[in-house]
Amino acid sequence: YAISKHHGNLESFEEYIEKLARNNEENILKDLKNISVSNNGILRDEILYKLIKNEDINTYFNFMDVYISIRKEHISSQESIAIFTLTKMMFSLLIASDYYSTSEFMQEIKYENFGNMGNIDIIKREYENSEIIKSIRNIEKNGISNEKDINNFRTKIFLEAEKNLEKNKNSNIFFLEAPTGSGKSNTALNLSLKLLNENRRKIFYVYPFNTLVEQNMNTLKNIFANNEKVIENIAVVNSVTALTTKDSRDIPIEKYSNILMDRQFLNYPFIVTTHVGIFNTLIGNTKEDCMPFYQLANSVIVFDEIQAYKNTIWREIISILNSYAKLLNIKIIIMSATLPDLSYLLDHEEKNNIARLIENRDEYFNNEIFKNRVEVNYDLLSKKKIEYTKLLEHIIENSLNSKKILIEFICKNSAKEFYELVKDSEELNINHEILILTGEDNKARRNSIIKKINNKDKKVILISTQLIEAGVDIDVDIGYKNISGLDNEEQFLGRINRSCKKNGTAYFFYLTDAKKVYKNNIIIENNLNLFSDEMKDVLKNKNFDIFYSKVLEILKRKEKEKSSEDNFETIIYNKKFRLLKEKMKLIEEQEDKKTYFFNRTLTDEEIEEIGTNIDGYEIWKKYVNILKEENYAKKIVELSKIREKMMYFLYELKKDVELNYSDIKGDIKVDIKGSIIYIDDGDKYFTDGVYNGGKGDMFI
């Protein structure tokens, strides 16, 4: 089956068997001959002919049907996932062998290494010699003198997690639950490096958003003091990062193939990536998805903010991770400040592979450093939608004694409407700089805003969408938020008084119904929100087990309601690879979107962040020329480089948004990204770097 698919995608093994059974003797012989030809005659035609001639095909397949039916009744779920994994592994190794052998032949070279091309040992060594670890080891040696100091408290969490990792080193999955601001990133880095050994030589760091990828790459750079020897061994793998930073003039044409293959097969010792990327590898069915699958074996994978993944497939996620960990010698760390106990969704015997690294999470969550960091206030919350004017008056009153104020809306249009109101308020704009941050903002603008709000001397009011909940490292005095799900509210509280050096306050209000924004979300659909006194109590006491037990119970009930043909076990048993990928989509594709390239003038703040000005039209021309490149590897590598610069000009709009199409200079079909429409006079759609055209929501 794997051989027959190596020029295509894994689809359904069940359909493959049925297709074979329907074919006549001549077609089967033809298929087998094709296999022989594609494998350089490894299977000789005369042997195949005798095999077919002396065998009654119908009898053979009737026997196979009976055998499969009987086998299905006796095979365990563990055997099913093992066969599923083996099939995917064989397919991945076959593709890799094919690609490497072809590349060796075409380039007349010999590959000696088919895995990590970097040096993981230098990362381990430099980490142990870093200032932060020296400080932690010093505290470990001399004891923690003052637990009210937040850094000492972080050290306590760090050391407890390290101790429990050693105690449970035979487990495959580790849960790390600790409060926001407690140093989880550094703790997880230490744990992942501890899990490396002679056979386990690769680390994956997985985040739900590109903003988190960027933020944590910066954290790693800070930990390693921008040591180039370390940083060059850490690769960011996502849709917005170039495959190489080298100028095309410095890359020999034959090197493009190596750069592309390193990315396709993830030939790096330490990878920082997104959940979409890693799950394409974990459960994807296309050739491109499966290329690096074999690299997951003998690795360490760290998942951050897993509660942000689509909760309707939590059960499938933990089942896949648990099985792969056992079968492929993977160690998995799952961490969050709001961590659901996903082991509840597993069978009893499967839970034995999971260990908690913090034994008594209440000791930390209920400590006054974290628990009382933010006072929650419900004066503005009622089931009647709040008026903008009432919200504005409340903010004006609080602005007198607050330097940093954050207001989060869950609808981008609401954020933009309120931003205009705040900008026009003399009471607010006379003392505070008014800023807005949404999902449509590019990296340069986002970083500029973060710097402003983290500047101790600046007074700032930031209006934002829910992207602020994770992946944006800011610290404010007061926060206002449109309610949604309880897990979202806790993530929002993590943006307030992060330093724990002052008193912070959060005000919740109701304006937009979360059900209109969050589709197919168990938490939102079941009203697990702050209208409930029970949920208010959970948020106050940080007892998220009560909250998540309700969510997990709903998921378990829904799983029982699924038909036998539709459930996870049946899909795995029948090896329906394509169907599994469809059912485990982390992000639903929005087909009502169009991508536009606005040729606009970058703001001074954007230019400062980028380090140079970028001419949109010149970037567009380079992009069009790259699309004409005939060398495939060079084309893909150069596209990844130009795409980094295009991100400052690319925006997604709903198809029904009306723009002045007389500004369009070209409409070009892109093989990978679909249609991109070029708008030449882009400046008229922007004010101070903020898109102001149309009502269509682009992102969140």
Model-derived segments and their meaning:
Residues 325, 393-402, 408, 413-432, ...:
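C-terminal helicase lobe and adjacent C-terminal extensions/tails of nucleic-acid helicase motors
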Residues 338-399:
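Interdomain hinge/linker at the junction between the two RecA-like core domains of SF2 helicases
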Residues 1-126:
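Accessory nucleic-acid engagement/destabilization modules that flank
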Residues 227-283:
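Inter-Walker segment of RecA-like/P-loop motor cores
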Residues 289-323:
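SF2 helicase catalytic motif II
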Residues 170-192:
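Walker A/P-loop
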Residues 201-224, 238-241:
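Conserved Walker A/P-loop ATP-binding site and its immediately adjacent core
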Residues 236-247, 410-413, 434-447, 465-469:
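Conserved helicase motor
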